[in-house]
From Swiss-Prot:
GO terms for molecular function: DNA binding; DNA-directed RNA polymerase activity; ribonucleoside binding. It comes from the Bacteria. It catalyses: RNA(n) + a ribonucleoside 5'-triphosphate = RNA(n+1) + diphosphate. Its EC number is 2.7.7.6. The gene is rpoB. DNA-dependent RNA polymerase catalyzes the transcription of DNA into RNA using the four ribonucleoside triphosphates as substrates. It comes from Sulfurimonas denitrificans (strain ATCC 33889 / DSM 1251). This is DNA-directed RNA polymerase subunit beta.
Amino acid sequence: MLNTLYSGNRLRVDFSKTPQQIEVPNLLQLQQSSYNKFLMLEEKDRSQSGVETVFQSVFPIHDTQNRLTVEYIDSEVGKPKYTVRECMERGLTYAVSLRMKTRLILWDRDENTKEKLGVKDIKEQSIFVRDIPLMTERTSFIINGVERVVVNQLHRSPGVIFKEEESTTSGNKLIYTGQIIPDRGSWLYFEYDPKDILYMRINKRRKVPVTIMFRALGYSKQDILKLFYPIQHINIVDNKFLMSFNPNDYSSRLTYDLVDKNGKILLASGKRLSAKKAQNFIDEGLSEVEYPLEVLLDRYLAKPIVDPETGEILFDAMTRIDETKLKKLSEIGVKNFSIANDLAEGVDGSIINAFNADADSLKLLKQTEDIEDENHLSAIRIYKVMRPGEPVTKEAAKVFVNQLFFDPERYDLTKVGRMKMNHKLGLNIPEYITVLTHEDIIESVKYVIKVKNGQGHIDDRDHLGNRRIRSIGELLGNELHNGLIKMQKAIRDKLSTMSGPMNELMPHDLINSKMITSTIMEFFSGGQLSQFMDQTNPLSEVTHKRRLSALGEGGLVKERAGFEVRDVHPTHYGRICPIETPEGQNIGLINTLATYSKVNEHGFIEAPYKVMKEGKVTDEIVYLTATQEEGKKIAAASNKLDKDGQFIDKMVVTRVDGEILHRPVTECNYADLSSHMVVGVAASLIPFLEHDDANRALMGANMQRQAVPLIKHEAPIVGTGVEKLVARDSWECVKARRSGIVEKVDGKHIYVMGDDDGEIYIDYYPLQKNLRTNQNTAFGQKPIVNIGQRVEIGQVIADGPNMDQGELALGVNAMVAFMPWNGYNFEDAIVISERLIRKDAFTSVHIYEKEVEARELKHGVEEITRDIPNVRDDELSHLDESGIIKIGTNVTGGMILVGKVSPKGEVKPTPEERLLRAIFGEKAGHVINKSLYCPPSMEGVVVDVKIFTKKGYDKDARTLELEKEERDYLEREHYDRLLMIDKEEMLRVTKLLTKEPLINDIKIGNTSYKAGDIINGEDLVEVNRFAMNAIIKSFSEEIQSEYNKTKNYFQKEKRLFRDEHEEKLNILEKDDILPNGVVKHVKIYIATKRQLKVGDKMAGRHGNKGIVSTIVPEVDMPYMEDGRGVDVCLNPLGVPSRMNIGQILEMHLGMAGRELGHQITKEFESKQKDFIKNLRAKMIEIADVAQMMNAAKTLGDMSDELLLHHARDWSRGVKFASPIFEGVNAVEFEKLFALAKMDTDGKTVLYNGLTGEKIKERVNVGYMYILKLHHLVDEKIHARSTGPYSLVTQQPVGGKALFGGQRFGEMEVWALEAYGASAVLKEMLTIKSDDVDGRVRAYKAITKGELVPESGIPETLFVLTKELQSLALDVEIFDEVEDNE
C-alpha cells in the first residue's frame, strides 16, 4: 500500500520509506473509553459500569443486631442542566445527577437469641447521591467554570514482586525480599535478615518471624515443615541409621562416604555419583544406605516422637537432634523417625531459623497471656505488632488476622493483582478471588527462598509489566468507593446507637451523601491529578490529556523518587515517549504515551508489532504488553526493506529483552510497526529528530506546547506528517460527520448536505469565535471550505487556532541566516527583520477576563452604576448608563471598566436628612468608589461583556439589551436551520417522486403529465406544501406511505428543533445562580494584540531557543543576490556545542521547498496556453523524488480546478513530510537541490545590508519553522514608582501581581559597598525601602522640585527591637545621649 499525497486538506510530499499499515489510534481514546466504562451513559444495560461495581462492593449494609439491612438496587444518571459554554460563563460545574435506588428491609427477630425470623417490612426509595462531573466532548471537565483535565496515573501494579537489595548493616551482603502489594489493604513483606532468618512484616511495622504468620493461620509445626522441606524417613536397625537410596539426592559431589547397610563403602566422599553407577547399584538390589551420624546431628524432627507404651509425646516436631536424644530413642525402642531435610537442593535453613527465632517471644507471651495454644499466641503476637498497647483476646486476634488479608471489604488485589500473582507463582486461582489465599502466602514464601538460592527470577519494579495506568474512570471509582466507605461507617455508627422502634425509618434517614460529595469535589478541585488544562494550543491540550504521572495519591513523592524510577527503561519502547518529559524536579516522573500505544483492559500499556513467520513479515498486527514481549525477538524498523516490505538482509538488528543484537531474520517473531512508534506526539512533530541530541529534542518537544496561536500562522514547509493527526484528534477544528456537498458557509455556521444510506441529510455545524482559553489565548474557528465543495466524512471543514488547512500550524516559515549580526545575536539572542513585524507574522491576540461583584453588605447593598463620586465626566464617557464599559472601547491602564459604589458604614441618618436625600438624590458623601479599573500594563479592545443578576433584583438596561441581542441571534439561527430542514425535506420528496411513474394524469405548473410518466424534478421546485398533498395522490400507495413517513419524520425533527430553541431561550431568561451575598456579577473581556517585541522568547523545533534582541529595518538586514532580504539572523555558535543538527537539515529542505515554490509561481505568471499541463508535470516531477507515493496517478487524475488550488498552496513553498528516523536522505537531498537549482552545500552569497558589501564567506541560508512562545515580555516587564507596602516591615511588596518593587538583596548591597557608593546605598536602604517618614518627605520634595532631605531611621530597626522584646530582652531606643549616661 502506497502512502497518500494528502495531508489534511493539502498536498505534502511524504518521504516515508515504509508504507503506513494502520491509522494512528485516536489520541484521546484512553480517557474517553475509561470514563465511558465508568458511567456508561449511552448503554441500555449499565450493570457492568464502574459506578454499579462500586455500589455493589459496599452494599448491602447489615445491622449487627439483625434489626435491618440496607440494600442497593440500581443507579440512575440524569441529564446535564446547562451546556458546557454556560457552565464556563456562569462558574458552574458541568455535571449529571447520580441517584441510587435503595431498599430498607426490616427483620422480625427473636428477642432472646437476636436471630432473624423473617421479613417484617420492605421500603424502597430513590436517593440523590450527588452531581458527578461529566466529561465534555473534548475529554476535559468543567469544575466551577474552569476547564480541567484529570491526568492518567502510572502506579505500581498490585501483585507480588521479588527484589534483592544491598544490606545497610552488614557489608555487601544481599538481602532478599518479597512483597505482596494489594490495590487496597495491608502490604505484606517477606525479608531475610543478615543471619538468614526469614521474617514477615505488615505495612512496614515491626518484623516477626515468618512462621508466626503461618501459625496464626492455623498451621501446626509439622504442617509448616512438610510445606517447605522434603521429609527424610530414618529407620533404626542395629544402632545404624538407614534411609532409602534415592539417586536424585546426590546430584553434586558427595560430602560423605556412601555406605550400604552392611557397612561397605560404595563411593568415597568428594566423588560424583553418575547415573550409570546409580543404575548399577539399583540393579544390584541396593535399597537402603546409611545416614551418617555427623550429618544427622543438628537436624530437626519433622514429626513428633511418641512413647510406644505410654502414648506420651517425647519429642515434638522441630526438636533438634543430638546424641542424648538418639540414645533415648534406641533405649525405648523407637524403630523409625522423620527429619526435615534442610540440606536438600533448593531449600535452606531459613524456616527452621524462623522457628528458633519465634520460640522465645512465644514463651514470653505464654506466661503473660496464660494461653497454651501456640497458634492463638501467634495471632495475638501479630495483633500486638499492628496495634501496640491495646488489650486483646484470642478470638479478637484470630478475627483481626483474618480481616487483614481475607476480608473482601478490607483487602482487594483486583483482577489485575490476581492475574499477576497467578502468572508469577504459577497458581490457578480463579480471577474473581481478589483476596489472598493461604496458597498465595505459602507460594510467595517458597519463591523468596528460591530467589535466595539463585533459582527464582528477581523482578524489576520499573518494568512496564509491573506498572499500570489508572485512568479517569478508575480514579473516580476509587474516590466514590472511599466516600461510600465513609458513608457505610456512618450508617453502622448510627445503627449501633439507635434504639426503640424502627418502623418509621426510611432509607434517607440512614444515608447521608455528604461524605461522597466532599471526597469527589476534593478530587476534582484539589487533587494532584486534576490539573488546570493547558490550552495554549491544540498540541499542548492533546499532550496534557495523554500525560502519565507517577505522582498523586498512591503514587510516588517527587522529593523521594530515585534515579531508577525516572530513567528510560527498555520496556518503554513503543509505549512511553523517551523524550517528552519536563525539565526540573519532575523529570522522568511525568511522561507521555507513545504515538501508537494503547492501554488494555487491565491498565497495561501495549505496543503494536507486525507478526513475522519464517522470516517473512505478514500483514497481521498485534498489540503486546511488556510482559508478553519478554523473550521475543523483534526486528527493528531501521533494517532495510524491499518493495514488498520484506527484509533485504539475512542478519537483522533485533531487540531481545532490551538488548540489541544481530540475529538471523528467520529467528524473529515480530517486526516494529513503524519507525516513529518509539516517541510521543510532540517529539514526532520534530523533523530530522534523529540528528538532534536527546536533551535538545526534549526542549523542542516541550517548547512546541508553549507556542502561542498567531493571527497569520502557516503550516510548516518541512513537516513530519504527524501534523494532520493532532488536528484530526483535537476538538478545536470542526470535522464533517457525513460526506456531502457544502450548502452554506459563513463566519458562524456551515451547512453540509450529505447522504447516508441513500437518504439526504443537511448537517449543521456552528462555529465559535473570540473565546478565551485557560491561558488567555484567543480561540476562534474559521471555515476552510466553499459553497458547492465536496467534503468527505471526517474531513476538517473549519480550522481552529494554530491550524492551517486541517494541519497543525504552530509558527511561521522564516528565512534564516546563520551568521553574527553586529554582536546582537550573542548568547542565543535573535535578530529579526522589521518586515516580519509589518506583515503581522508573529502577532497574537490574547483575551483577558476582568470581573467585579456587587455584594450585599451589613450596611447596605453595593451598586453597579455610572454615578460615581469624585470622578470627572470625561473619565466616565466610555461607560453606558448602567456604568458598564461599551463593547468596542479601546482601553488603557487606569480606565474605569465597571463603575461600582459601596455604602460607607455610617451613622443612621435623621429623618430630615433622609427626606433631603430622597428629594435631591444626595448620595455622594455616603458611598465610596469601588470601581473596577483596567490594570496599568493592559491595553486592548473590549470584545464582550457578561452580566449576571441575582433572582429578585431588577435587571439593568444593559442586561436587557444584551439579552435582546442574544435572543435575536438565536431566532436568526433557528430560522436558518428551519429553512435548511425545509430544503432537506423538499430534496427528499423530489427524489422520492422522480423515481416512480404516475398512476393518474396530472398537471404541474404549465407541464402536463400522463399516467406512466416520470416527473421532472425541476417542475417540483416551485410547488408549495398544499399543492404537493394533491400531487401525491397521483402516485401508488407505496409512494404515498413513503411520503407520509418522510413528512412525519420532518415534523418530528422540526418539533425537536423548536424544543431545543425554546430550551435555549428559557436558559437565557432563567435567573442566574450566584454565590451567597452576591447581587450582580459582571465579566469584561478585553482582547489585546501583541506584536513581536524585543524581549519576547522564540524557538525552533529543535530546542534552539532565544530572546529577540533587536528588530532591524528591512533595508539593513543582509540580502541575497536577487535582492531578497533575510528575516532572521541566528548565531552559528548555537549549533555545534548543542548538537542539534536537525535544524540545519530543516533549513536546507525548507530552502528547496521555497525555491521550488518560486518555480511554480513562474509557471503561473507565464500564463501560456497549456500552463496547467506544465504545472501538473512540474508538480509530478517534484513529488516523484519521494519513492513511496503514487504521485503521478493522484495528480494526473486531479481536476484542473483542484490542481490550481493546490498549486497556489505550493507556490508559497512546496510542503514536505520528513518522518522521524526515515526522513530525507542524502540522495534525495541531491535530487531536490538539482530540481531547485541550488548549490549542493546549501550556502548562499550574502551582501551586508548596511554597506552593500559582499560578505566574505558564503552563508548558510534557508527556511526554518519558528515559533513565538508564551513567555511574552509584555506580561513580564513591570515598573513602579510608589505603591503598596508590606504591613510589618514597611518595605515595598514584591512581584508584578501585587504591583511590587524591585528587590535589592544582600548581594546587591555588597556590590554597592564594593564600589564605595555610600550615598546611593543609604538611599536604597532608607527612603527607597522602609524609612516611612523619609519617603513621604522625599515624595513631597520631588513634586515641589526641591532637594531631597536627609533620610531617617528605617522601620527595620523598630521591627528588630520588637522582635528582641518578644524574646524578653528589654531594648529601648533613645533619640539622643543624655549627659549623665
